[in-house]
Amino acid sequence: VGTLKGKSFTAQFNRVDAGAGDNVFTYEGGKVDSWELSCAVDGLLTANLSMDFAKETIGAGAGVYAKATPTYPTSLVLLSFVGATVTIGGSAFDVTSASVKGDNGLKTDRYGIRATGTTKNEPLEADMREFTASFNAEFQSVAHAQRVAAATAAGALASVTLKWQTPDTLHSVQVDLPALRFDEGAVNIDGPGILDQAINCKALTPAAGGSPVTITVVTPDATA
């Protein structure tokens, strides 16, 4: 997890109107403010990005504003719940849904009074980054409730890995959270059905150092 200062991207969208006409929208100075990876039973792994841009330009032009031709990976695949595993403390844990979120803590409203040039400065980190995870599962044991109630920091932590993989193992996305603190693990009784447990956690920096979250993407493509 490094600094975001000086890092940005340009995105372009072609929005087709009711008359089947192309309308190019170009966005410059882009940064990801927050993100989420999530998946549930019967669903696909999805990524949701909240993005902030410095400038919007409508209409095709020259250079970066020219209508671009999109390119796609040669082996594009979808990852689903079928090839997913969640491991907590080294043991597999069956869940009905899982989510990992990241908030970069950016100040995106750095506006100033200026007669010339841009009136918005680059968004910078104005708060500590926060990484959280949540799981919904059938109530299987008191293990995670005990983590929430633990009297020591060590007792509340567990190493968690989430992995989505295709059957041929050529494509995968893996999220490693080496020091996940269990903050909530409510088990409520609302009827005669199987009890559910909602688990909410926060990723911490490991005591030995390193990143609180690592995302590894594997693909057979020579370039990603």
Regions found by a protein language model. Give the residues of each.
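Signature of extracytoplasmic/envelope-associated structural regions
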Residues: V1-A224
